[in-house]
């Protein structure tokens, strides 16, 4: 939604050198600590070694207590995976987590481990124990740094801002800001010109404004306008493209809202009507049929968990600008 993955990957490409190795892994598909350890070891071995012999040597040197099962494809340098046969309660896990530090020492370099969709670890069984183990090992490493990022803001916030969790204040938190309109205008117009088409500054700006500068939506809407443009983008091209973006996202919005309770839908209706705080006043409770003050808290937590609302500067908002328009049409708000 915000382009964080592409930003991190671009930074990785720029920073990579003989003295700084970058390891990137996406753990979205990991459903257990065992999945994580397999993915972690595979990524570290693969992305810090330039030859098959080298990562096989590193396995022998640094994973001596483990008998990993190695699967190779046609290209062993890019197509291989590791399955670790280990006892989760033994020191073998620490051996895996220490792998990047030991490789960095051997190579005389520093390593940055970039882990995408890091919030997945909150879903693991005995997650808090798992988190404690990661932090206890990682915080003592001297040559390895960690860039941990994810797409579910409320879960990431909880992992790093909840005092009772192991990763509390583990590092500096960076919240990505939206890309500025001026930068988007130059980018959009440049992409049109590269294909012998034109779009005015005003229309490019309108694309940004209509979707509140959300990276994925700006790119999607600009692309839809581009498809409809013959030579010069028109207002009609823009309006048709905007309807397209609503239509294309309607199935997703329907799926996200079909199981909502009446209270939850009423809460969203209140936001659409301009209520962003003080939901527990008698006037708001009665007008939008939200039940009791306690019920409002339950509804709010549920909608935050579903990522349908967010809290920004103590104001409750619907963060998705296209969904906002769709909801208004559906609810007649």
Predicted regions located by residue number:
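C-terminal leucine-rich, beta-strand-based interaction scaffolds used for sensing/assembly
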Residues: 247, 251-333
């Amino acid at each position: 939604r915000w382009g964080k993955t592409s930003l991190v990957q671009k930074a990785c490409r720029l920073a990579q050198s003989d003295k700084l190795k970058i390891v990137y892994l996406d753990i979205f598909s990991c459903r257990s600590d065992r999945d994580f350890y397999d993915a972690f070891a595979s990524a570290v071995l693969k992305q810090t070694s330039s030859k098959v012999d080298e990562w096989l040597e590193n396995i022998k040197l640094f994973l001596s207590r483990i008998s990993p099962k190695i699967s190779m494809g046609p290209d062993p340098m890019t197509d291989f995976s590791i399955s670790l046969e280990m006892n989760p309660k033994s020191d073998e896990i620490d051996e895996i987590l220490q792998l990047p530090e030991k490789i960095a020492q051997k190579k005389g370099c520093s390593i940055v481990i970039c882990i995408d969709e890091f919030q997945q670890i909150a879903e693991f069984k005995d997650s808090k124990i798992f988190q404690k183990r990661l932090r206890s090992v990682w915080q003592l490493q001297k040559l390895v740094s960690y860039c941990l990022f994810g797409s579910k803001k409320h879960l990431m916030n909880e992992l790093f801002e909840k005092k009772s969790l192991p990763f509390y204040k583990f590092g500096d938190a960076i919240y990505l800001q939206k890309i500025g309109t001026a930068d988007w205008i130059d980018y959009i117009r440049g992409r049109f010109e590269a294909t012998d088409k034109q779009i005015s500054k005003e229309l490019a700006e309108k694309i940004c404004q209509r979707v509140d500068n959300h990276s994925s939506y700006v790119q999607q809407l600009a692309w839809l306008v581009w498809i409809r443009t013959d030579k010069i983008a028109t207002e009609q091209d823009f309006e048709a493209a905007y309807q397209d973006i609503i239509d294309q996202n309607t199935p997703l919005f329907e799926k996200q809202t079909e199981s909502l309770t009446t209270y939850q839908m009423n809460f969203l209706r209140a936001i659409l009507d301009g209520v962003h705080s003080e939901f527990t006043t008698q006037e708001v409770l009665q007008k939008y049929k939200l039940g009791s003050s306690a019920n409002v808290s339950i509804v709010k937590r549920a909608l935050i968990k579903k990522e349908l609302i967010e809290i920004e500067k103590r104001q409750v908002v619907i963060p998705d600008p296209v969904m906002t328009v769709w909801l208004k049409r559906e609810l007649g708000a």
